[in-house]
Swiss-Prot record:
Family: Belongs to the PAL/histidase family.
Keyword Ubl conjugation listed: no
Record-given protein name: Histidine ammonia-lyase
Sorted UniProt keywords: Cytoplasm, Histidine metabolism, Lyase
Single GO term (MF): histidine ammonia-lyase activity
Amino acid sequence: MTALNLIPGQLSLAQLRDVYQNPVKLTLDNSASAQIEASVACVEQILAENRTAYGINTGFGLLASTRIASEDLENLQRSLVLSHAAGVGQPISDELVRLIMVLKVNSLSRGFSGIRRVVIDALIALINAEVYPHIPLKGSVGASGDLAPLAHMSLVLLGEGKARHKGEWMDATEALKVAGLTPLTLAAKEGLALLNGTQVSTAFALRGLFEGEDLFAGALALGGLTVEAVLGSRSPFDARIHAARGQKGQIDAAAAYRDLLGERSEVSDSHQNCEKVQDPYSLRCQPQVMGACLTQFRQAAEVLAIEANAVSDNPLVFAAEGDVISGGNFHAEPVAMAADNMALAIAEIGSLSERRISLMMDKHMSQLPPFLVANGGVNSGFMIAQVTAAALASENKALSHPHSVDSLPTSANQEDHVSMAPAAGKRLWEMAENTRGILAVEWLAAVQGLDLRNGLKTSAKLEQARGILRREVPFYEKDRFFAPDINAATELLASRILTELVPAKLLPSL
């Protein structure tokens, strides 16, 4: 379990990756208390002065002009949570729920939401006890915030709904006991503060970023393996080429390839005097394509790092001035656009890998046996594995269609433009799974191709990648049940073992 002392607004991408991947023991830094208390005092002052303020003593959405009597304020907050818990679909995974909850604690603790410390501490207690509310996967359009999923998260605090602890579902009252809690009664503004925000959208996109980074790292290593398997040239990775263009992502990707390939190997020495002048684009242009993908991940990471530390509640409480101001920080357009751009990168990583696989199948291009197997005709070898890769690459082309350009008005046209950020982030997971499958086939094919090179060795780092696979999957001497091999390679990729072969500084969250 990771220990994390949360200083509001200062979570790093590396910390967020750790929260997603591992249970966390969360504490809130003492520096947060003063601002939290000041925002609560501001809300209480507004009520004492009988001032009208949206979300504090009014209805919501199109009902914002309806003033709520003082005696109904607690019921208003409870009713808000209950009515907005209208999500559908499979439950979000524990890892993602944990990330969502930490993001929500981070935002609330900034002290612009008018929510008491006791409510924030209750969320922290659930996180630390590994009690994860049941949050359905679907039901948010990413404005006004992620209302339905965050309402499901908040239900448990009221003793409603259900939660999962160590893989077992239980009623909210039992779940609260596990965390040493009893049901809360929410004060004015608190229900809205819990529900309003982009934390679900941001968590979805962050998962896409983390998986995309790992796929990027794996694709670098496998692209290097394929260069060696088909007797490709190291010349296209020469630093001078990339410096002349000046694209930072391309320069860094080329440097990573040079690190993986090394200056020379037994394989490269074996064709030093060949007559081939240029390699196909899927080999030669890897730094250009992968560099562009790296730039997309880095830009998305910058946006998501800001959003993870943002206050995306509405209205916001500015305690120093005694003001409560309505705005639109709940609109997750930055997250949606970041996710859309990452979708392009994930699709391109898979597309480029599939082209390299296809190249290895062609004996004229690869100088290897057709479909990487002896006695072709009797044996089909990697023929249909490449077809599988093509199918996955094609799926990703459709999935990469932008979501941020879509919008449907809601709440009787009061909320007339929305971001669709949750859908933009969520489809990244399916795309990542598809690309992982493509890369798994390339890993199998590239190592098979190298093994057909009469015992020649590649560079030290690429030999590591070769050995990792061969410990799980034997050489393909003749046709056998192929799917288990792909599954084994896919599981190795999911373990992030190839990420360790590239410099950590290359990727934002490492």
